[in-house]
Swiss-Prot record:
It is found in: Plastid, Chloroplast thylakoid membrane. It is a multi-pass membrane protein. HAMAP family: Ycf4. It comes from Atropa belladonna (Belladonna). GO terms for cellular component: chloroplast thylakoid membrane; photosystem I. The lineage of its organism: Eukaryota, Viridiplantae, Streptophyta, Embryophyta, Tracheophyta. One of its GO terms (biological process) is photosynthesis. This is Photosystem I assembly protein Ycf4. Belongs to the Ycf4 family.
Length: 184
């Protein structure tokens, strides 16, 4: 979502609360729970899941491996649910031409650096840069080159923008900030 006026441009960034992350976390949770139940039922010798009899799965080695995969999947699933609940990666980009300041804010993982806040002057921005990597997994990322601080990515690497969309976004931002565009 973007909000613009004559002097201020605010772009809200969605973090890890995306539909795909919810789906993957849910599928991974159910799958790993199934693996753990199968491993546990082979250990107990009782049928906890009615899809197939427990006599078909011997605890050593199949039951142990299934239990291990189930536990590992539950850990990964809990990691995904935590990143979703903390909304890691969300935030905003605020470009204020009137005050001459750019503010970039992102939420991180809990701890000392939970709030990531970058603030610098518009006059320190050298250019808006588009980095394009073509191939099987094409990637187009929009960067802002800052004098003395390097490049700051403005779009996520998993955000699959078409060439037209990334060019339009870069052109609008470069026009708003009155800086040149570079393409690599």
């Amino acid at each position: 979502m973007t909000w613009r006026s004559e002097h201020i441009w605010i772009e809200l960034i969605t973090g890890s609360r995306k539909i795909s992350n919810f789906c993957w976390a849910f599928i991974l949770f159910l799958g790993s729970l199934g693996f753990l139940l199968v491993g546990t039922s082979s250990y107990l010798g009782r049928n906890l899941i009615s899809f197939f009899p427990t006599q078909q799965i011997v605890f050593f080695p199949q039951g142990i491996v299934m239990s291990f995969y189930g536990i590992a999947g539950l850990f990964i699933s809990s990691y995904l649910w935590c990143t979703i609940s903390w909304n890691v990666g969300s935030g905003y980009d605020r470009f204020d031409r009137k005050e001459g300041i750019v503010c970039i804010f992102r939420w991180g993982f809990p701890g000392k650096n939970r709030r990531i806040f970058l603030r610098f002057l518009i006059k320190d921005i050298q250019s808006v840069r588009i980095e394009v990597k073509e191939g099987i997994s094409a990637r187009r990322v929009l960067y802002m080159d800052i004098r003395g601080q390097g490049s700051i990515p403005l779009t996520r690497t998993d955000e699959n923008l078409t060439p037209r969309e990334i060019e339009q976004k870069a052109a609008e931002l470069a026009y708003f900030l009155r800086v040149p565009i570079e393409v690599f």
